[in-house]
């Protein structure tokens, strides 16, 4: 007989207080059809590919570290559009609106030929090749070898109006007192990716300085560094979407060599030493006495990867990208008039070898070659050029819009001079004439407060573009590409004629006061 029972499942009720909804920038920002082109100079940097070079005292940096495996983080500073002397003042009403920039197009230009760079360590911790081993491996006190390899191939760029968020694994604080020699706990940390931070080259995104005390497990360029990787999951789920409008990446690698580490194993393979011998012969059977296998070898296996073929057929650079719809709520609006472009590209990773004759005399007078008479140097160069298409947009000064902007970044309202102005305590102030006179009181020692940079202390490649904007898009390569793809050109019998693109969305005509 069928019997009815009440539902035993939980009943979920909506929250008592409404959840604040974050609006997309497309919901409240009005776009005009005024476009600007901006580009940087040729940006060049030269340095040593593996480490900083200091003087003998270690007090002066003589040659900085410049590697193809580093992140390049460009901070493009744009002019304030609200201070522009616009020819058509009907573009916006300063009493009810503010102007902002929107990114519509981007092209990251890269110079220099394609090339593969190698990295390595003169004391690399590898015992032997474990892929094609013809004898059993035995350890000694020092099995390090001079080894080099090519890194994982990576091309990537991230565009946003705040710095890119990176992730790496670092040493964590133990819950209690930890015995010396035990593996420390590790945790995932989020930090901003700064200019010069190393990218992952095949050994993971960890703090090698804190987690590898032997200083021989990785190559020279990262042995004293922290390799970071963009935290795409965090940036894609950001409520405002300022750190990453869009990105492009291409990574590839394969395991080229297989080695094993030297040293004492920290985590022994479970065997007869566990418990009362209940794990005996579970993972291996010991070798006979007198055999090389009587002492078990290390199981710390690892590969050295290779980035494989570098080809011009798979390049992300030297080509335009158009932003129609960003992945987050911010559809390309450049708050605070700045733009962050984070780039990694090691497909142009050639390291120059420079040899210098260290003896007196000319090279033509050398009788016999002697390697001791020549000094070998290494240098790496990077070449960039960035072009952007900017669109002029209007932000209405409405209560709901200002409330969201204030919650997102209250300093924007201060820059727009919309902050709260308190009522003066005294309508008249005291002003002395002779401030340097001994008969007059000392002036106020507190200096005026300067604007605090929210990214003070972080290292970026600052590029000033306040005077590099142009309305003549057809005079630039990226501008002509934008006009063509946007349909702002029309073909006539006499040639190609550009339709006006400097117009704007005209506002309501103001009434004259009587």
UniProtKB/Swiss-Prot annotation:
GO terms for cellular component: host cell nucleus; T=7 icosahedral viral capsid. Self-assembles into homopentamers. The capsid has an icosahedral symmetry and consists of 72 capsomers, with each capsomer being a pentamer of L1. Interacts with the minor capsid protein L2; this interaction is necessary for viral genome encapsidation. Interacts with protein E2; this interaction enhances E2-dependent replication and transcription activation. Pfam families: Late_protein_L1 (PF00500). Belongs to the papillomaviridae L1 protein family. Its main location: virion. It comes from the Viruses. Residues 495-514 are annotated as: Disordered. GO terms for molecular function: structural molecule activity. Keywords: Capsid protein, Disulfide bond, Host nucleus, Host-virus interaction, Late protein, T=7 icosahedral capsid protein, Viral attachment to host cell, Viral penetration into host cytoplasm, Virion, Virus endocytosis by host, Virus entry into host cell. It comes from Human papillomavirus 47. This is Major capsid protein L1. It is found in: Virion; Host nucleus. Forms an icosahedral capsid with a T=7 symmetry and a 50 nm diameter. The capsid is composed of 72 pentamers linked to each other by disulfide bonds and associated with L2 proteins. Binds to heparan sulfate proteoglycans on cell surface of basal layer keratinocytes to provide initial virion attachment. This binding mediates a conformational change in the virus capsid that facilitates efficient infection. The virion enters the host cell via endocytosis. During virus trafficking, L1 protein dissociates from the viral DNA and the genomic DNA is released to the host nucleus. Coiled coil: none annotated. InterPro entries: Capsid_L1_Papillomavir, Capsid_L1_sf_Papillomavir, dsDNA_vir_gr_I_capsid. GO terms for biological process: endocytosis involved in viral entry into host cell; virion attachment to host cell.
